[in-house]
């Protein structure tokens, strides 16, 4: 897996902003090439669904909690600016969180000094709240302050925008990250209490023509992928979008009918929930079902990862995800990824979502989003899907 990083700030149309994206290496691939991945996974057990269901009990009543999680396989990053004059940052555009955070110049952790940091004294529009925030990733507690300033994405400006400024980042994987922070595109219910997410602020301030954004992930791994804000460019898909109503308004959550392989139901047997997550590279589900799927594709657990024969990418059948009575095939070339060496391939399925609650839940990450152009419609609380061109 690799990171998508912005090439240029924006390409403007009359009504929407289109942000071009391309790929660089993921933290996982970076560690693998340095022969550090195996030891890292042993020392830091990897929980891919850490960010979902984060409880406020992790922090005291006087401290706000901002969602933070594992970044080993995060996929989408792009450039924004904060402050006046603007300070540039590369951030993850994440649909499963709602906060914005970047490192502060007061952070001296190794993960901070290897990335861009925000200097409040250089911005004439910065306002401090003197409010502490705690970010709770799996391998350490990141602390910081809540501030307010002007945030710009393309030509859209969010005035007096709340964001977290990390002052300590004792999180090992962040040292190898190709991004500085996170910009969440989820619902306000996921945000720090008393704050407004960037997208909602832009909407309230009349910056966005339409309350929608969309993701197109090109099959060309190096170029062509884009994030659209404020509208939809029909050139990135064919036919009509298939609309799916949200089943909850926090994550971009929908109802999933079933998952089948060669006509046999292998997951979501009685209907379940699915979260579309641009901040995840994988297809995540309950461990029991995932274990069965790994056996189906003959994946073997080697060196803390599920490895698959590379020839299976062209021989195995599609998994069919049925959503709102529409079938969405996921072929083997998508659910089995190539490794950094020709003979190494890996499963893009992973378990652990049973910890989210009693109801069966699946996470549809890059594997799914790369196949289907996706519109996130806040105006009508729905998601639009169509085969990407």
UniProtKB/Swiss-Prot annotation:
Belongs to the peptidase A1 family. Keywords: Aspartyl protease, Disulfide bond, Glycoprotein, Hydrolase, Protease, Secreted, Signal, Zymogen. Its EC number is 3.4.23.-. It is found in: Secreted, Extracellular space. One of its GO terms (cellular component) is extracellular region. Disulfide bonds join 107-112, 268-272, 311-345. The active site is at residues 94, 277. Residues 76-386 form the Peptidase A1 domain. Pfam families: A1_Propeptide (PF07966), Asp (PF00026). One of its GO terms (biological process) is proteolysis. It comes from the Eukaryota. PROSITE patterns: ASP_PROTEASE (PS00141), PEPTIDASE_A1 (PS51767). The keyword Transit peptide does not apply. Glycans are attached at residues 79, 130, 348. This is Pregnancy-associated glycoprotein 1. Expressed throughout the chorion, with the signal localized exclusively over the trophectoderm. It comes from Sus scrofa. One of its GO terms (molecular function) is aspartic-type endopeptidase activity. Appears to be proteolytically inactive. Residues 1-15 form the signal peptide. Its main location: secreted.
């Amino acid at each position: 897996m690799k990171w998508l990083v912005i090439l240029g700030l924006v390409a403007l149309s009359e009504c929407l902003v289109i942000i071009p994206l391309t790929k660089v290496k993921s933290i996982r691939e970076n560690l693998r090439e340095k022969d550090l991945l195996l030891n890292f996974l042993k020392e830091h057990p990897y929980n891919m669904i850490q960010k979902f269901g984060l409880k406020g009990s992790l922090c005291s009543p006087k401290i706000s909690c901002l969602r933070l999680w594992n970044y080993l396989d995060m996929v989408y990053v792009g450039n924004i600016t904060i402050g006046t004059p603007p300070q540039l940052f590369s951030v993850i555009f994440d649909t499963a969180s709602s906060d914005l955070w970047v490192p502060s110049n007061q952070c001296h952790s190794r993960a901070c000094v290897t990335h861009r940091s925000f200097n409040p004294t250089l911005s004439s529009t910065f306002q401090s709240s003197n409010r502490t925030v705690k970010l709770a990733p799996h391998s350490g507690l990141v602390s910081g302050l809540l501030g307010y300033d002007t945030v710009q994405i393309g030509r859209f400006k969010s005035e007096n925008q709340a964001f977290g400024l990390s002052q300590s980042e004792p999180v090992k994987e962040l040292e190898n990250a190709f991004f500085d922070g996170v910009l969440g595109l989820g619902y306000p219910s996921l945000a720090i209490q008393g704050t407004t997410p960037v997208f909602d602020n832009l909407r309230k301030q009349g910056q966005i023509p339409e309350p929608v954004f969309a993701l197109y992930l090109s099959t060309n791994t190096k170029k062509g992928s884009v994030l659209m804000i404020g509208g939809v460019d029909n050139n990135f898909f064919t036919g009509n979008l298939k609309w799916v109503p949200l089943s909850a308004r926090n994550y971009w959550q929908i109802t999933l009918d079933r998952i089948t392989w060669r006509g046999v139901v292998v997951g979501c047997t009685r209907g379940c929930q699915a979260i579309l997550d641009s901040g995840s590279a994988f297809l995540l589900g309950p461990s029991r079902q995932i274990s069965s799927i790994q056996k189906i594709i003959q994946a073997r657990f080697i060196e803390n990862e599920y490895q698959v024969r590379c020839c299976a990418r062209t021989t195995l059948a599609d998994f069919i995800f049925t959503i709102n009575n529409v079938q969405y095939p996921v072929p083997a070339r998508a659910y089995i990824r190539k490794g950094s060496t020709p003979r190494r391939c890996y499963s893009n399925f992973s378990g652990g979502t049973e910890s989210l609650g009693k109801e069966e839940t699946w996470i549809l990450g890059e594997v799914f989003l790369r196949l289907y152009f996706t519109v996130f419609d806040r105006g009508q609380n729905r998601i639009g899907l169509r085969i990407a061109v």
